[in-house]
Swiss-Prot record:
<dbReference type="GO" id="GO:0003723">
    <property type="term" value="F:RNA binding"/>
</dbReference>
<protein>
    <recommendedName>
        <fullName>NADH dehydrogenase [ubiquinone] flavoprotein 3, mitochondrial</fullName>
    </recommendedName>
</protein>
<keyword id="KW-0813">Transport</keyword>
<dbReference type="GO" id="GO:0042776">
    <property type="term" value="P:proton motive force-driven mitochondrial ATP synthesis"/>
</dbReference>
<keyword id="KW-0472">Membrane</keyword>
<dbReference type="GO" id="GO:0005739">
    <property type="term" value="C:mitochondrion"/>
</dbReference>
<dbReference type="GO" id="GO:0009060">
    <property type="term" value="P:aerobic respiration"/>
</dbReference>
<dbReference type="GO" id="GO:0045271">
    <property type="term" value="C:respiratory chain complex I"/>
</dbReference>
<feature type="transit peptide" description="Mitochondrion">
    <location>
        <begin position="1"/>
        <end position="34"/>
    </location>
</feature>
<dbReference type="GO" id="GO:0005743">
    <property type="term" value="C:mitochondrial inner membrane"/>
</dbReference>
<comment type="subunit">
    <text>Complex I is composed of 45 different subunits. This is a component of the flavoprotein-sulfur (FP) fragment of the enzyme.</text>
</comment>
<keyword id="KW-0809">Transit peptide</keyword>
<comment type="function">
    <text>Accessory subunit of the mitochondrial membrane respiratory chain NADH dehydrogenase (Complex I), that is believed not to be involved in catalysis. Complex I functions in the transfer of electrons from NADH to the respiratory chain. The immediate electron acceptor for the enzyme is believed to be ubiquinone. May be the terminally assembled subunit of Complex I.</text>
</comment>
<keyword id="KW-0249">Electron transport</keyword>
<keyword id="KW-0999">Mitochondrion inner membrane</keyword>
<comment type="similarity">
    <text>Belongs to the complex I NDUFV3 subunit family.</text>
</comment>
<keyword id="KW-0679">Respiratory chain</keyword>
Amino acid sequence: MAAPCLLRQGRAGALKTMLQEAQVFRGLASTVSLSAESGKSEKGQPQNSKKQSPPKKPAPVPAEPFDNTTYKNLQHHDYSTYTFLDLNLELSKFRMPQPSSGRESPRH
């Protein structure tokens, strides 16, 4: 319901409406923070104010050394137009002949 109203007002009207609503929410937040009494429990006695030590930070994990000498696929970055030609020639003797439909191909 609010979207058509905002669209009719244009950019300036929508911005003005958003700023007004933001002020309402800011006022609500300050009311909530003032209504809560700090430092007293429900019985009216002050809470134990023990000083807590800051949380201990875990020891930093040592970084693993970068070693690219153990990379197994050494030809990975050497692809070219002839990369698979030798494999294609080796496997060509194992290929089965393809059945023909009886018609000549369009290139003949």
